[in-house]
Each structure stands twice: as C-alpha cells, then as structure tokens.
C-alpha cells in the first residue's frame, strides 16, 4: 500500500516538473523567437518523461483519447496557429509595423525582386521554426490532453492569444482607420501646414560665391544605437568605430558630450523612400507621391540645384522600390539615374554569385562605393551625387565573409554586427579616397542613416534610438550643434545650408536650417504633437491636389 502511494507521489512530482518545463517552452516559444534545432535538452527529456508516464499510467487507453480521423485536423490547425505567431514575430523584427501609413503606402507599390527576397526570407525563417515547434507541441497536446475537444480548446486559446497580442504589438486600429478613410478621397484643410510650410519660391535663397558640390550618402538602417555605450549607443563593443570618429571630428547635430548626434523618426519618415522624400521636400511622405498631383509641384533641393546649373546623379544598388525612387528623382530634376542592373553591367559583376550570396540581384556596399568613385572621376562640376547602401538591412544584414568572417555563419546577431562593422570600414575607405580628388575641398559630404533599424536585434528596448547624421567639409559653423532635436523634415534646408546657400528666415518646407539658431518643430512642439499634426496633412495635400486639378481644368 505504502509502495503504491510512494509510486503515485513520485509519478505526480515527475509529471508536475515535466509539465512545468513543457509549459515554459510554450511560453518562451510564444513570446520569443525559437530557432530550430536549438531547443533545450531539458525540454526534450521532459516530453519523454510525460510520454513514458502516460504509457505507464495507461492514460492512452481512455475513451476518446486517440482517434486517427482527428489527427489531420489537429495537425493542420496547430501548424496554422504556430505559423501565424511565427510570422508575426518575423514581421515585427523586420518591418516598422507601428507605422501603419508607411506600410500601406509601401504595399501600393509593385512587387519587385526585393519583395520576393523578403518572402523567401519569411518562408526560410518561419517554416522550419513552425515545423519543429509544431512537432513538439503536437506531442504535448497528445500526451497531456486526453481528448480531441481539449486539444482543439488549447489550439483555440493559442489563436485567441495571438489575436490579442496582434492588437497589442501592432496599431491595428490605425490600419483600420486609414483603410476606411482612404486619404486619397478625404479632402481637408490643415492650418498647421499652411502656417508652417515655407515655399522655396517665397523666400530669398542666395548661392555662395563659389558653388559647392554635394555627395549625399544614405546608410541603410544606420542608427547611433550601433555605437558603444560610451558614445550613446547600446553595444558593449563599438560596431561603427569609423563612423563614430567621423561624427566626433565633424558636424553631427544632436551630439552631447561623448555621445554622437542623431535625428528622430517622425511620422511619414520611417523607411528608405519615405525619408528621402521627406528630406528632399521638407514634407513627410504620408500620401502616395505618384497619385497626389500637388506633390509634383512642390520644390525639393534637387530642383533648386537644377535651377542653378548642377549636374545631378542618383544611384542605388538594390532593386527595392527602385522604380519608385527613379520616378521621384527624375520628377525632381535629377539628370542621371542608375539602378542595380546598371551597376552590375558597369562593374562587370557576376549575377550568379550575387544571387547565391544574397538571394537576389543586389549590389553590396563595397561595390556601390566603387561605382560612386567611377562616377566622381568623370562628373563635371558643380554636381550632386546621391546614393544608398544596403548591407545593414533588416532583419540581420547582408553578411559578406570576404570582409569579416565569423565562426557561426548562421548566428543572425553576429551577422548584423560584422555587417555594421564592414559598412563603417568601407565608408571610411571611400571618404579617405576622396581626399586626393581635385574637387574634394569644394565638396560638402552629407551622411545619413536612412532611418532607424527596422528589426529588433541589437536595438530592442533601447530608449534613445536615432539615425546617424554627419556633415563633412561644410562651409559653415553651426550656431548650436549639441542637444538639438530634429527630424527628417529639417534636412531640406540644412543640406542646402551645408553647401553654402543662405536662406532668408532659415526655413524651407516644414524644416529648419540646423546651422541657424532657429528652433525646429520638434523643439517647439515635441515629437508626439508634431506627429499628430503630420498625420492630418494627408487630407490637406488631397485638398490642394483638388484645387490644382480644378485650376488646370479652368485654364
């Protein structure tokens, strides 16, 4: 009798411990990204213990415990809910889903090679993960739960929990609001826009005595968080030492003591195209550029440079939204535009190698800098050259073993670390090479992180995330450089000012020249208040487009 009691107590204790370990695994899987084949041996042992106990106690003999006809239903539903959650985790680590307007605007664009790569990465990440977790949870529900009803109830609870966390992690109501209101059909007047937008044609813009050239470099996802803690970042070891030194030795707005400077992401400026649009026009990208006629009449710094005789070239080495970029810069009077196909041909790159290394035809940063050098060797002055890097793109960068080799090439965090390290190194090499060029002394170089990193690796929960800004070889000394708070809209007048242009009133678009003492809208209003006003601008731009169409018809 006592032996039976002791046996039951031992079985109960083992069962409780095993169930606790299994439930811990379920929770960890649910809230964190579980990588295939890296599951704790303790979890596997716990499942085996439950399986053995289930057999010894003959639970499997109970009525309705095991029906073969129910297995496909349980397997399919379980795989579906686990894949749904895995997909959400992947998307949150890859895209800025908190910016509903940007996501919906991006989805309006044609499906390109970069989008295919994202789909490929999504499937390669989520399918193996889902398969492994599904097998383990399938064993869990069959060992621990003794009927199909209970198993389906578990799956239902899993699904409901996922939907609840979708509403917590993603601003679903913002998506619903935007889709139901359709900005393209909603016309409204914005007092904020009218009072704060400065039309470049309405103010005096004076050229310097000698026109200065411009090299504008957008570094993919490069934020100050990649620096070490001493310099305002979040890393134990500095991933961008060369960029950090450049920021310290040159002008970097927002710097403070040993911390390098950075800009804030405001509404309508959280992806590569939206930031270029915003920094060029001083107007946030909150409505579709192609479908909003009035935006084509607003003047960017590219149009201003065009009016003053500048030769202007733009290129990007990756196909992501290339046609969108191309149409925008041509509309803004850029003379020559080159895409990945052009770079591949001119640099004589092997397409098969590119696809093998990165999954699609994209030109890595080291080759993009080479292409920039070839252009600068032949371009006539005065000129502006704008180009983008790509290697540090979310979710884990584009690892190049020829730059820095890591032991575990499947470690996503290490991939991103060495990728950031390589971009910093390649940028520095490029800038050093420019110093020997005849045009260098008369050329302002502006370096931006195009936006904050869209994933969570290395940056999660860091409160002070900002995109990098560096102004090199400029003709002015800023009145105030430290502790400045600014966003993308302020880059429109600041870029021109860095080239020696004088702007009466120190404002263009919605932006403020950071070389002046004037306060930016972020400094005046705060970022949250500014974002609320920016979100209302879409209706005003539709309103102005309506008036434009009406005036054109009357003419």
Please give the residue ranges for each predicted region.
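Transmembrane and membrane-interface helices of multi-pass
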Residues: 2-183
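Generic detector of well-ordered alpha-helical segments enriched in charged/polar residues
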Residues: 89, 108, 120, 132-133, ...
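Short extracytoplasmic/periplasmic juxtamembrane "stem" segments immediately C-terminal to an N-terminal membrane anchor
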Residues: 106, 184-199
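Solvent-exposed soluble domains appended to multi-pass membrane proteins
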Residues: 200-555
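Basic, amphipathic N-terminal segments that precede the first structured/catalytic domain
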Residues: 162-191, 355-364, 368-371
């Amino acid at each position: 009798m006592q032996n039976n009691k002791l046996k039951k107590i031992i079985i109960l204790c083992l069962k409780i411990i095993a169930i606790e370990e299994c439930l811990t695994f379920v929770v960890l899987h649910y809230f964190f990204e579980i990588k295939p084949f890296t599951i704790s041996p303790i979890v596997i042992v716990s499942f085996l213990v439950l399986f053995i106990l289930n057999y010894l106690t003959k639970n499997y003999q109970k009525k309705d415990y095991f029906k073969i006809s129910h297995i496909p239903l349980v397997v399919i539903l379980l795989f579906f809910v686990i894949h749904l959650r895995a997909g959400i985790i992947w998307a949150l680590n890859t895209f800025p889903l908190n910016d509903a307007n940007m996501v919906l605007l991006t989805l309006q664009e044609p499906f390109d090679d970069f989008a295919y790569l994202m789909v490929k990465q999504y499937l390669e990440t989520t399918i193996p993960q889902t398969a492994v977790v599904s097998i383990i949870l399938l064993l869990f529900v069959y060992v621990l739960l003794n009927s199909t009803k209970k198993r389906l109830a578990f799956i239902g609870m899993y699904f409901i929990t996922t939907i609840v966390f979708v509403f917590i992690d993603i601003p679903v109501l913002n998506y619903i609001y935007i889709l139901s209101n359709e900005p393209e059909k909603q016309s409204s007047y914005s007092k904020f826009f009218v009072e704060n937008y400065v039309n470049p044609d309405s103010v005096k813009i004076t050229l310097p005595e000698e026109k200065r050239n411009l090299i504008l470099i957008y570094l993919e996802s490069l934020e100050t968080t990649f620096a070490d803690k001493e310099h305002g970042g979040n890393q134990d070891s500095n991933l961008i030492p060369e960029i950090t030194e450049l920021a310290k030795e040159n002008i970097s707005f927002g710097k403070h003591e040993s911390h390098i400077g950075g800009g804030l992401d405001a509404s309508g400026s959280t992806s590569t195209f939206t930031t270029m649009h915003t920094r060029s026009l001083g107007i946030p990208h909150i409505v579709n550029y192609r479908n909003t006629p009035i935006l084509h009449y607003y003047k960017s710094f590219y149009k201003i440079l065009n009016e003053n005789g500048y030769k202007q070239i733009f290129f990007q080495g990756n196909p992501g939204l290339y046609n969108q970029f191309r149409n925008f810069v041509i509309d803004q009077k850029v003379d020559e535009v080159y895409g990945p196909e052009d770079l591949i041909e001119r640099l004589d790159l092997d397409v098969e190698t590119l696809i093998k290394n990165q999954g699609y035809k994209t030109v890595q940063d080291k080759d993009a800098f080479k292409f920039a050098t070839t252009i600068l060797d032949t371009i006539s002055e005065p000129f502006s050259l704008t180009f983008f890097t790509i290697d540090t793109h979310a979710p884990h960068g584009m690892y190049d073993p020829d730059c820095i080799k890591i032991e575990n090439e499947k470690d996503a965090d290490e991939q991103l670390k060495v990728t950031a390290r390589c971009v910093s190194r390649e940028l520095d090499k490029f800038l050093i090479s420019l110093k020997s060029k005849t045009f260098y002394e008369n050329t302002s170089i502006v370096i931006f992180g195009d936006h904050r990193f869209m994933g969570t690796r290395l940056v999660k929960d860091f409160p002070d995330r900002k995109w990098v800004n560096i102004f090199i070889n400029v003709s002015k000394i800023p009145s105030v450089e430290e502790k400045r708070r600014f966003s993308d809209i302020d880059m429109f007048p600041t870029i021109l000012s860095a080239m020696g242009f004088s702007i009466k009133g120190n404002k263009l678009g919605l932006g403020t020249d950071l070389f002046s003492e004037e306060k930016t809208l972020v400094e005046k209003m705060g970022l949250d208040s500014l974002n609320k006003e920016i979100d209302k601008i879409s209706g005003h731009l539709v309103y102005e487009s309506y008036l434009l169409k009406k005036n054109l018809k009357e003419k």
